[in-house]
Amino acid sequence: MIDLSQLSPMMQHYMETKKEYPDCVLFYRLGDFYEMFFDDALTVSKELEITLTGKDCGLSERAPMCGVPFHALDSYLYRLVQKGYKVAIAEQMEDPRQAKGLVKREVIRVVTPGTITSSQVLDETKNNYLMGIVYMDGIYGISTADISTGDFMVTEVDSDRELFDEINKFSPSEIICNNAFYMSGVDMDELKNRYQVVISALDSRFFGEESCRRILMEHFKVGALVGLGLEDYATGIIAAGAVMQYIYETQKSTLEHITTITPYSTGQYMVIDTSTRRNLELVETMREKQKRGTLLWVLDKTKTAMGARLLRACIEQPLIHRDEIIKRQNAVEELNMNYISREEICEYLNPIYDLERLIGRISYKTANPRDLIAFRSSLEMLPYIKRILGEFNSELLAELGREPDPLQDIFQLIGDAIVEEPPITVREGGIIKDGYNQEADKLRHAKTEGKNWLAELESKDKEKTGIKTLKVKFNKVFGYYFEVTNSFKDQVPDYYIRKQTLTNAERFTTDELKQLEDIIMGAEEKLVSLEYDLFCEVRDKIGAEVIRIQKTAKSIAGIDVFCSLSVVATRRNYVKPSINDKGVIQIKNGRHPVVEQMMRDDMFVANDTFLDNGKNRLSVITGPNMAGKSTYMRQVALIVLMAQLGSFVPAQEADIGICDRIFTRVGASDDLASGQSTFMVEMTEVANILRNATRNSLLVLDEIGRGTSTFDGLSIAWAVIEHISNSKLLGAKTLFATHYHELTELEGTIAGVKNYCIAVKEQGDDIVFLRKIVRGGADKSYGIQVAKLAGVPDSVIARAKEIAEELSDADITARAKEIAEISSNITQHKAVPKPDEVDLQQLSFFDTVKDDDIIRELDSLELSTMTPLDAMNTLYRLQTKLKNRWKETG
């Protein structure tokens, strides 16, 4: 325990400040460095790999110390915050040269992963979200804010899966929550590990209903929350209030740039769950977690950071209302038709800086003079963009053409006040233009004249002393001085007062030089102080126009997104899809947008698609692995998603029925973090799809049942097809790829099921994948041929052929045909039952063994109380028991 009374005054203040922020690393400003002491120094030196030293502190031993230069704060800060630390910044609040006694210092902000605002470390193409989650009475209130841009949203969901979908959509850097959230049953370890997010449960004072309502009403200056559209979000209000209070306390700012809060329902947009976002690789690839190879990579030709963020949001939240989709399409189409104007707009967009984050820094009072110059250079482009947009007639482009406020008053203010090439710091002068302020001009004149006086004094003393190398110089420690080289030091007059001795020279002052120094330094100090005040005044005037600036920034972002979609459409030969409410998806010569771009020209094989809610609602797609089934299915899902975000699509023609949700079950992978096997992950995702899909959903299911035995897998796949294709149970449009070619027997026996396969050309024992989807089912899997293509040794291939002949699956196929006939008879002579009346034995492979002890044990299992490991052990035991029985019966 440190005895504070023994510490020096500065170290006592450090420890008192640290006591106020015990959960933070304290960056304590000392001159040109931010220093850390004691335990913080040990932590930071280890985490950032910087040198650990010591400092006399009044104790018998030196205090451990490390530090970082003030001008490099952001990079060190970001690295520490990325490791999960909170950092409190204690700044000098007065000039140390003018301080009487201990320099006044105080914490000006606390930096956490979700409250970083520095443009030097944030990815300009992504939002940096802070998310607040409140769990109360079975409801999750969710509030999401990006304090660097001012975005602020709120919603509510009532299930863990919907919660995870929202977290996946926004990818927050930090989550704050109430203690009840930890008790809600959500797997916190999975949440932290899967999304790499810092989660903190805050004190209950953040979540008082009345205090949360009050802080929102006070911030947005309203008498009731009804005016903000929040009346239906009781739990969401608490989440939003907690987020606002947290930002107030960490940033110690009025948050003037957070001007609106947007309530939304998850039903306003197409629902894309976590698995689908991952499988379709919308904004990052599954393996490398990078942008290249994603839909965002294909569509992003934006010129501004604001546009890049908005495009990402559009991909994450496709529309479900036909009129809104068509408005976006018309904007893209008009830009396509006016190629020259579009290219001109893109040229003017290119120099525009990130206005949203600039106004955020201006509101936080952290913007420097160069930020204002960047702001002005951006505003210079607005009149040109506005003029060109005046030529367009489509509703959204015409609206965007009216909205951008050129902000000429701000443009003029910055031009009048700030020099063209200012310094990056605000307290060293050189910021304000001549003519902007009379007092500054006077001080600047005195400073300039002082320089002339110094030049005259130098010339006069050179002549008077005969010292040819005599120079008047300056540094911050000694001020102004005469410097004389050693070869002339014998000629220095007696009235010269020595100030410093160097290796090759000596430094002196005189009474006359001291007088000039007082005049010049006085003028310089006053000028630096005045320029700082004037700069802050200009910055505050700009900050007062935050609403105008944000509206303009959002308009520019919208224009940028439409131009980006138009550029991609024309370069990649995309077409404008028709949008219908009839549930029909018809695509002629559709192409996968990402795969096409990564292949050489004309190498991609286009394919047709037809799905509806009637006779063509489920396509069973068979064919060998590597033939292109997964690519084709993802292609259809991406084309639908692109159409609903308002983009043109890679096809010759397309008519897209609006889908409320897209679900995918593609690929196989163990979820080791949560102890789930490949098969358990697969079945969990299938269960989610069957429970949450609707008639208007699009389902993409790849190789259902592959993670278990052939009989079980085929049984499950068969039953899933029956359930989905039954219009009274679900009836969703579905692409169902499978290696169970026995499932092709379902066409003609189950309404709405159609067979398709990947065309294959056989050349002796070899095969060629034609990548073409054709009607009909594959009668074999070509697994051995695929193994040969993959380079499996010839000896293994030969042995596989021998075994395949011995293990002919004709019996399975024959049994499948029998079941298909039973199914056909049942559907012809029996009304389709309600879900709770479905006969569990219908179409069972084991329909003759209802009294079997294995069946009875399966029926008695309490699945809801079993862990994944228990379930797998039970399945293994029952499977072993069944295999032993088969051996006994021959």
Task: Identify the role of each PLM range.
Residues D354, Y364, N368, S378-M381, ...:
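Charged, surface-exposed helical/loop "interaction arms" that form contiguous linear patches used
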Residues F207-R213, V222, M270-T274, L282, ...:
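Amphipathic heptad-repeat alpha-helical coiled-coil/stalk segments that mediate oligomerization
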Residues S844-G890:
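C-terminal tails and terminal domains of large nucleic-acid-associated
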Residues A90, P113-L122, T254, F392-L396, ...:
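Active-site phosphate-binding and catalytic loops of NTP-dependent enzymes
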Residues F38-A41, Y233, K303-T304, C314, ...:
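ATPase nucleotide-binding head domains, primarily ABC-like/P-loop NTPase cores
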Residues I325, V332, R342-Y348, F375, ...:
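Amphipathic alpha-helical coiled-coil segments
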Residues M1-E334, N350-S363, A367-S459, T827-D836:
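Charged catalytic and DNA/RNA-contacting regions of genome-maintenance
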Residues I167, P172-A180, V186-D189, A201, ...:
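Conserved catalytic alpha/beta cores of large enzymes that bind or transform nucleotide phosphates
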